[in-house]
């Protein structure tokens, strides 16, 4: 089910504060480390790099224009797919 149009997109407060601090200070664009996979990508995030936790390690995510409106967690996969079990004796 989609999010209601009455509500604004969700971003964790601590993440937004970090982004605004980087934008205001014009500081070097260091990666922002976050565990907030549920946060929606805003247009202010374009050009920034986030390190999103996937449960095991931090994955670098460089935000581009096409990613706006998606969640950060969509770009840091949590599972690895090794293929379906194959019969080794079958040819």
Curated annotation (Swiss-Prot):
SUPFAM superfamilies registered for this protein in UniProt: Ribosomal protein S19
Keywords assigned: Ribonucleoprotein, Ribosomal protein, RNA-binding, rRNA-binding
Name of the protein: Small ribosomal subunit protein uS19
Disulphide bonds in the chain: none
UniProt gene name: rpsS
One cellular component term from this protein's GO annotations in UniProt: small ribosomal subunit
Gene3D superfamilies: 30s Ribosomal Protein S19, Chain A
Role of this protein: Protein S19 forms a complex with S13 that binds strongly to the 16S ribosomal RNA.
One Gene Ontology biological process: translation
Family per record: Belongs to the universal ribosomal protein uS19 family.
Pfam families for the chain: Ribosomal_S19
Record flagged with keyword Lipoprotein: no
């Amino acid at each position: 089910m989609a999010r209601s149009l009455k509500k604004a997109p969700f971003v964790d407060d601590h993440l937004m504060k970090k982004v605004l601090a980087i934008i205001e200070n014009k500081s070097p664009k260091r990666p922002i480390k976050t565990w907030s996979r549920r946060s929606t990508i805003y247009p202010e995030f374009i050009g920034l790099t986030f390190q999103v936790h996937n449960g095991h390690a931090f994955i670098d995510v460089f935000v581009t224009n096409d990613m706006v409106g998606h969640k950060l967690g969509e770009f840091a996969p949590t599972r690895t797919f090794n293929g379906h079990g194959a019969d080794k004796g079958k040819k």
